[in-house]
Amino acid sequence: SASDRADALAFVARAARMNEAAVIRLQGRPDGRLGLWTHTGFDVLATRSIVGGSAPADIVCDAEQLRTVLAVADAGTRVDPGFTFASAWKGALPPASGYVHVDDVPARSVVELARSGAKLARTEGSAHGPATGLLDQVVLEASALDGRQPVAIILRSVFALTAMGFIRDADGREVTDTSELTRIADD
């Protein structure tokens, strides 16, 4: 669909913007969707799924090449992602199942954490970027209603969420560095 194509294009464009040598891993899922995966600059995997498939069912391609063909292709048409870059993919993907919903975190909280973290990274970082210790700092803990299964969320994950455009305001628009906090829902 056109919205799936737009989602894929936005995801791939953000990956390419974060890293000019970014690769995208396309992998068919058991539910009939296509998973798009990329390594962010924060050592965090990011993924998006769309309706679709690929042949072969698991392929690694250049993000910029894929962005270029997605930008000009009509919805519903097959795209050729170009040459495969299997050797450019580092590591394995996480399991396809076994996850549970633990809690919802308000978008405003994530944005405030990202902005505070960015400010601290600018003052405490170096020419090489933020210190690893800062990125690995737990900035939020989420847990189920019964208090079990606490999940520690580190700053690098918060940065990856915002850099990949996964945080939206109350109207569904992407939150940026200049977005007003009042436009982001409290809950």
Model-found features: residue ranges?
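N-terminal ordered "arm"
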Residues: 1-51
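Long, compositionally biased intrinsically disordered terminal regions
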Residues: 76-187
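A broadly used, surface-exposed interaction patch
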Residues: 45-81
